[in-house]
Amino acid sequence: MSDGDDAARRRTAAVTDYRKKLLHHKELESRVRTARENLRAAKKEFNKTEDDLKSLQSVGQIIGEVLRPLDNERLIVKASSGPRYVVGCRSKVDKEKLTSGTRVVLDMTTLTIMRALPREVDPVVYNMLHEDPGNISYSAVGGLGDQIRELRESIELPLMNPELFLRVGIKPPKGVLLYGPPGTGKTLLARAIASNIDANFLKVVSSAIIDKYIGESARLIREMFNYAREHQPCIIFMDEIDAIGGRRFSEGTSADREIQRTLMELLNQLDGFDQLGKVKMIMATNRPDVLDPALLRPGRLDRKIEIPLPNEQSRMEILKIHASGIAKHGEIDYEAIVKLGEGFNGADLRNICTEAGMFAIRAERDYVIHEDFMKAVRKLSEAKKLESSSHYNADFGKE
């Protein structure tokens, strides 16, 4: 019996000892894990400190511009500080890229060309490129079938199939002017073209180009066209072109003269790029009668496309496009709504849908009925009477 008790005690002691050692092992594992994390953090801190020390000890480099190559090994470079040097080139740098006007990095001590830099881009031009035109299909533009066809022939066809023009022996249009009353879809058309073509899109608000310093506005125009040439295919869309494209006159303030200099630079750039090149220009305005004749001549803006107020059929198409995403209940008589909306443009028709939705929300409904649309069109018809159409000359371009 005593042997059995001894065996039980030894077993209990062994189990207790095992548990203690297991707990001790887990504790050691936890300590090792913590130590590894601390080591990892210390290594990270060490590497960061080492990088900081290197950056403090490193010598800056000079930015220069290649004027012209002398031979296979040496080039004439103008440093940013002003003086000119004859310098060599690092073996890893591609010498074919070092053409006149290329920005380069020069070593502080030896003035050797270390690497080539991309062209300097004005932040204003850079921001133009990064404006998203949105995902707009041609089917979202209602009532403008002929205008879409003409615009695609002028802009999309030369970019996608330039060989068609070469085969026929004609020169494609360089640029297109979209003109018409406000709210008829000029900007929407340009955005639809941009989202359906795999090309860079520069959206320019003409009034934003004007700068108070003499020559800055013209420099922006030059940089914009240079950037477009380097990033072909590219579409430049200049909205509200009447801000800089108005008729020139002899008298005026210094601000007027700056606008005229900007226009002359724009005309010069329009003459400068190749017609078969992959840079196309779209301009939009609702004041075509004030534009300078030099801007409108063929060879600069070859096609003038009028975007008129929609007729009854076009209004029906536009209204159905805007109403397609609205939760509706019952039959909607679009024909009656369109008849009441005589003289409405595309923006007004979109506003009808918004106002109809507001009437539904006011009635605590989550759907729109026909009566909401009728109330909305009557309300907007009253507001429409306050608008004036005197700013748009409907006779422009008609003989």
UniProtKB/Swiss-Prot annotation:
Binding-site positions, ATP: 180-187
Coarse class of the protein's main subcellular location: cytoplasm
One GO molecular-function entry: ATP binding
Presence of keyword Translocase: no
Transmembrane segments: none
One GO CC annotation: proteasome complex
Localization in the cell: Cytoplasm; Nucleus
Cross-link (Glycyl lysine isopeptide (Lys-Gly) (interchain with G-Cter in ubiquitin)): 203
InterPro entries assigned: 26S_Proteasome_ATPase, AAA+_ATPase, AAA_lid_3, ATPase_AAA_core, ATPase_AAA_CS, NA-bd_OB-fold, P-loop_NTPase, Prot_ATP_ID_OB_2nd
Domain of life: Eukaryota
Keywords: ATP-binding, Cytoplasm, Isopeptide bond, Nucleotide-binding, Nucleus, Proteasome, Ubl conjugation
Family annotation (PANTHER family): 26S PROTEASOME REGULATORY SUBUNIT
Quaternary context: Component of the 19S regulatory particle (RP/PA700) base subcomplex of the 26S proteasome. The 26S proteasome is composed of a core protease (CP), known as the 20S proteasome, capped at one or both ends by the 19S regulatory particle (RP/PA700). The RP/PA700 complex is composed of at least 17 different subunits in two subcomplexes, the base and the lid, which form the portions proximal and distal to the 20S proteolytic core, respectively.
Family designation: Belongs to the AAA ATPase family.
Function, in words: The 26S proteasome is involved in the ATP-dependent degradation of ubiquitinated proteins. The regulatory (or ATPase) complex confers ATP dependency and substrate specificity to the 26S complex.
Protein name (database record): 26S proteasome regulatory subunit S10B homolog B
Origin organism lineage: Eukaryota, Viridiplantae, Streptophyta, Embryophyta, Tracheophyta
Primary gene name: RPT4B
